[in-house]
Amino acid sequence: MKPATKVPFLLLLAALAGFGAEPYRKPPKAVLDVMNAPTTPVLSLSPTRAYATEGRPVRYPPIAELAEPMLRIAGIRINPKTNGLHNATFNSSLTLRKIPEGTEIPVQTPPNARLSGPRWSPDGARFVFTNTTAANGIELWIGDTAGKTHRVEGVRLNGVMGGGGGGRGGGGGGDVQWMPDNKTLLVSLVKPNRGAPPVLPAVPAGPTVQESLGGGAPQATLEDMLQNPHDEDLFVYYATAQLATVDAASGKVTLVGKPGIIESARVSPGGKDLLVTTIHKPFSYLHAYRSFPKDVEVWDLTGKMVHKVASVPLEDKVPINGVMTGPRNIQWRLNEPATLLWVEALDGGDLKNSVPYRDRILALAAPFTGEPREVFKTQQRFGGMQLFAKGGMALVSDSERKTRIVRTFLTDLDKPGDARLIWSRNQQDRYHDPGTPIGKAMPNGATAILQDGDNIFLNGAGASPTGDHPFLDRFNLATKQTENLFRSDDDHFESVVALLDDHAGRFLTRRESPTEPPNYYVRTPGGSPTAVTRFPDPQPSVRGIHKELVKYKRADGVDLSFTLYLPSDYKPGTKLPTLVWAYPYEYNDAATAGQVSGSTKRFTEIAGYSQLFFVLDGYAVLDNTAMPIVGDPDTVNNTFVEQVVGDAKAAIDKAVEMGVTDRARVGVGGHSYGAFMTDTLLAHSDLFKAGIAESGAPNRTLTPFGFQSERRTLWQAPEVYLKMSPFMYADKIKAPLLLIHGEADDNSGTFPIQSERMYEAVRGNGGIVRLVFLPFEAHGYRGKETIEHVNWEKLTWFDKYVKGAGASTTSNNY
């Protein structure tokens, strides 16, 4: 087992110069008051559109919750006390609302609830949710539209595979589905009578051995892999589940089949069959559970196998950016009782192979005795499929990695070869994104594209040179003509949540502005909004903050932008200490690199460890600062350093030109790849007085098989990896650097050792550096005490080295 806290690791850190345990600190009261404001509820519409559930997320769980036991095995983080995911996200309360009236209906929930879901029955009469407790694990609860709920006694759900996110955060509930009959639930239970968990042997049976006999494929660096036979035993113990059906009225539980490591189980649209994927040995110590060998089978409701769809071997030879051979993306055709659809590679799963078609879609109907029927082929890699409610109509997409071109075809799965190109665009071209087809719940519980005659409806972000203006369009499939039904105005950010009828005559929106908190409204095309909710402003103290979209150019002419935030008491002409906060992205061309993202018309809400807290401390913040890296996808990183320095210089120059920034007092920061960017800028420029690097990876040689969109390995492009490793230039970092890292970082490539080694490199070369390891925190930080402390660290560091630039370097703050 890989524990959450590594004692030898902490002992090593304690030996480092200047390292020691410190108590959690709190930021100033003004920051705390804003940070601890209540969260805004989130609505989930019922299939009938007559009701919505309203959940209030738990924003900051206490660090004690994150400190609960954690098993880090097979790419999953398991809480053995609950048999669910560790560090899961929950709602603290649940309410019903009638739509469109907005009338609230209280929902009976248990005290101190940690709720996940809910999931509506297909007829919208009932909903199911889970409650996670230390005593009972993951409980199953059922509610109705009157707000009455009850717990299904004797049911303990297994949330290891069905918790929403596969071990990386996500919801904490088990895998629960409504059957098409609206009366029955399919659930995954903790294996009955499984006994006590495996005990770590006092004496190992022998060494842990890995061996490759050639033919292996490059593997990305991953966290939380199996490490020994005991880990394997733990994985089997906690991941093994028992499928069962539950009668929603009586609570009767009927076991289905034998227990197994059930990765997924999906009810057929006809409600008579199950598509079950079961993981089995041999496991891998280099891959997560998703790559383990598995069997994909069709079962009847007694658990008897009626058809073997595929036996999938260990996916240890799949090339990076490639796909497995054999059936993948296996699913039910949602408008037939029991027809399977899946995708198979025609190029061996490797983009390096030149073939006329890369993928094909196959279909096989019950009783699954005939030969699969080919229904579509894609020239590029299959990107997704959305089905219509009636007939064989579907939208199928493919994508070409090098050009980033995504194409969408309208095809009839019942008439192979009959396909029309509907859209083709660069996936990074936000300005020409047609939007996403809106779906509708079918009587069997599946969701299909909503079709109104020849029309479908598209919902999109509406990116533009002035920011995002979400829209609702009617799109004619026959003529490919688009009619706009709604677009957010220039003073608000308003997005369509759902249609309230099949013709877009009424729809539900979420509307906000810089001074109006997000609320839900009912609209008609061209009509005025009618309020459904009236949530109050949770943070009135930040309402005077100035927010502005600023556009400018890089020295080579690439269009750039940032969102400028200024304190509410800012006086024009005052030059402020400034924070540049950013995250680099790669682009094929300057046109897409220069596109504006986001909107200044959104409600300003500051939470977590947001960089916007600096505004409350008297800083100007250049948020979402564009840091494009432009070039051929195969070689774009050859000039990463030069481009990111040019991006940063252009941003500072613009802010200084506007009169809001004191050039002598500018700092930089970022999270993950933004942290890597921060290290790079401090190593290769003198633009900044200090930096903040959260959960970064400054040594690219520790990610030797690629990172971000880099396609070459360390051995193919060693000079690029070395140049792009600010760790190698630690002796050049003279500006004070604050390194913050979750002690239990779960992100690929950003191992905590990255920041540990960077600290040693800068310290050993005489630089000013501080390393903060956050107990029990992953790649993103969640604990209440952690969030408070991180805000204190960041503000204190910048107050000392940026706001107070030129002052004494000694301080009692640390």
Indicate where each model-derived feature is located.
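Short beta-strand element of the alpha/beta-hydrolase
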Residues: L566, T574-Y585
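Active-site-proximal cap/loop segments of hydrolase catalytic domains
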Residues: A88-S93, I99-E101, Y585, A591, ...
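Beta-propeller folds
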Residues: F19-S528, R534-I545, D559, G594-Q595, ...
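Bacterial N-terminal signal peptides that target proteins for export
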Residues: M1-F9
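N-terminal cap/lid segment of alpha/beta-hydrolase-fold proteins
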Residues: T533-T574
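Hydrophobic h-region of N-terminal signal peptides that target proteins for export
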Residues: L12-G20
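Conserved hydrophobic/aromatic pocket- or pore-lining residues that grip, position, or stack substrates
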Residues: V296, L340, I422, Y520, ...
